[in-house]
């Protein structure tokens, strides 16, 4: 798509979170606590995508993300792309990926799991990154996709 045809305005410096599934867009926005951010934010949903049919996009001026924030995005929408923008140009493109191990980000759904009864961090292994299937290191309960509850 040419720049003059863009539905969502370009930003000078910042980050573009692209290829968000439309059903996950507002969950990603909530997760990143965008309502508390005092930066210029542009959100577009159900935009045309050649590869996915439709997509969501979030553009945030003058913002970078910590690795933990990226891990959280990957748990909700594992195939999101991040574009780093400087002076209106994309200087870096990055695919967000689910990490091999997730510590302190996800709640175990097993009420008998020690992490729900003792003051300790949860720890999960990713057993299928594409389906985002996790297994608790302590009780071995498996959970996937929309059943993942972030802390």
Swiss-Prot record:
> Among the record's GO biological process terms, what is one?
pyrimidine nucleotide biosynthetic process
User: Can you quote the record's cofactor note?
Assistant: Binds 1 zinc ion per subunit.
Record has Metal-binding as a keyword: yes
**A GO-annotated cellular component:** aspartate carbamoyltransferase complex
List ligand-binding residues for Zn(2+).
108, 113, 136, 139
Enumerate the GO terms in the molecular function aspect: metal ion binding
Which NCBIfam families does this chain map to? ATCase_reg
Into which family does the record put it? Belongs to the PyrI family.
What interactions and quaternary structure are annotated? Contains catalytic and regulatory chains.
Protein name per its UniProtKB record: Aspartate carbamoyltransferase regulatory chain
Q: Which gene encodes it?
A: pyrI
């Amino acid at each position: 798509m040419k720049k003059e045809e863009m539905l969502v305005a370009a930003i000078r410096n910042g980050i573009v979170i692209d290829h968000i599934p439309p059903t996950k867009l507002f969950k990603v926005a909530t997760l990143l606590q965008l309502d508390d951010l005092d930066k210029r934010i542009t959100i577009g949903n159900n935009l045309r995508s050649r590869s996915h049919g439709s997509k969501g996009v979030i553009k945030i001026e003058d913002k970078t993300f910590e690795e933990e924030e990226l891990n959280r995005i990957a748990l909700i929408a594992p195939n999101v792309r991040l574009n780093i923008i400087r002076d209106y140009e994309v200087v870096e493109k990055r695919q967000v990926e689910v990490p091999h191990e997730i510590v302190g980000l996800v709640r175990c759904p097993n009420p008998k799991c020690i992490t729900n009864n003792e003051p300790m961090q949860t720890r999960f292994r990713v057993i299928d990154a594409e389906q985002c299937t996790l297994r608790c290191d302590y009780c071995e309960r498996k959970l996937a996709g929309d059943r993942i509850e972030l802390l």
